[in-house]
């Protein structure tokens, strides 16, 4: 019996160690901001940011394409495993938006003198990033807000967050996961429908059959298509793309 408990203790300890290493080396990414066309703002500003466990690399294809089209692009890579969604937004997203709004206001004053139309700020965000921008826009009003594009958004949560295992592993996967449960009282389901120009893009193909087994209905490997929808926001399915491969398709950029 003692031998059994020793083995069990070793297994539990090893599991915790593995989970801790996964969190530190695979799920945790540093805060950084990347600018495109920063000193040559002749078109609108587009702010982009990732979803949970994501990096700026995932949005690089979109960022570079938009920059090639002349937009001033600002990508925010932020840590996603330490805070809840509201805290992440206030800590990492708000300061950059404030920075860009201040810059845009100055530019628009100069353009007004020249009788040029005002420039706007748009947002292109992936997955959980949609929850951050919806929370931000619920709490703040932007006078020069343009288009908001939500890619693969868990607009009404995901069954993956409902799984009891997610509650047990909250320390390792991050407290923000609980914000994306599908029950009506969850954080994401308290954000309401957008009152601004908002579009939803989502894939229709899964590359993770284990996750798909936990999700009801058609999904993109992470998010159910049915719960991505938002009232009043047009939805476009990008065919043959998954939760992440959708970010590397020219069709996605064309829809933005």
Where are these regions (language model features)?
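Proline/glycine-enriched tight loop/beta-turn segments at coil->beta junctions
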Residues: 38-45
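Membrane-interface motif at the C-terminal end of an N-terminal transmembrane signal
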Residues: 16-34
């Amino acid at each position: 019996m003692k031998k059994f408990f020793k083995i069990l203790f070793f297994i539990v300890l090893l599991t915790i160690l593995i989970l801790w290493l996964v969190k530190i080396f695979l799920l945790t990414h540093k805060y950084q901001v990347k600018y495109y066309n920063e000193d040559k703002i002749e078109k609108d500003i587009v702010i982009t940011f990732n979803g949970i466990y994501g990096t700026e690399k995932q949005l690089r294809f979109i960022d570079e394409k938009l920059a090639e089209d002349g937009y001033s692009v600002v990508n925010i890579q932020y840590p996603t495993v330490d805070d809840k969604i509201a805290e992440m937004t206030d800590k990492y997203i708000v300061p950059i938006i404030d920075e860009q709004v201040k810059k845009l206001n100055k530019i628009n004053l100069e353009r007004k003198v020249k009788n040029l139309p005002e420039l706007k700020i748009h947002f292109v965000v992936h997955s959980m990033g949609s929850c951050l921008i919806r929370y931000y826009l619920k709490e703040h009003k932007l006078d020069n807000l343009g288009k908001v594009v939500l890619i693969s958004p868990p607009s009404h949560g995901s069954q993956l967050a409902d799984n009891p295992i997610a509650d047990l592993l909250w320390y390792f996967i991050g407290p923000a996961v609980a914000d994306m449960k599908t029950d009506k009282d969850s954080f994401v389901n308290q954000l309401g429908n957008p009152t601004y120009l908002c579009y939803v893009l989502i894939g229709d193909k899964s590359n993770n059959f284990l996750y798909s087994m936990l999700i009801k209905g058609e999904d993109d490997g992470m998010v159910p298509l049915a719960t991505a929808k938002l009232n009043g926001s047009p939805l476009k399915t990008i065919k043959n793309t998954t939760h992440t491969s959708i970010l590397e398709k020219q069709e996605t950029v064309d829809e933005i």
